[in-house]
Amino acid sequence: MFSEVKKEIIEAGIMLDRYELVSLTCGNLSVRMPSGEILVTPSGMMYEKMVEDDMIVMDLDGNVIEGTRKPSSDTPAILHIFRGRPDINAVIHTHQPYATAISLIPGLTEFRVCITALANAAGGNVPITPYSAAGSIDMGIDTVKVTPHKEKI
């Protein structure tokens, strides 16, 4: 089920690791299929070792349709984003060192983008959500709250 998309997700995860946007098993990728199913990367698995059968297919309520691995610990937040933002079809959760550091600055709610190429790619300044514990739905709640019309945070 969804073999080609699973391959693309794994390849994207390998690229995230190569460019140090994630490390070890941190971060996750998920995609909403046109038919409504959600594909989620498994928890605790390095992308370079991942194969299609490791991916989890679930519905918006978190019921597993296909897959035997444990889904990402951020699944509650991911599903909240997909439910709250029907226009979003992919969630890429990285652990970029600089972005993580910026997110820890108290009171900072937006990252001012001042490099033209980055501004074009980001569509302007980038909203920042408050820190939330790993596996908490709070990340999803905050993402939906601060990004009603933004695609990147």
Annotate the PLM regions:
Residues 1-153:
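Glycine-rich flexible loops
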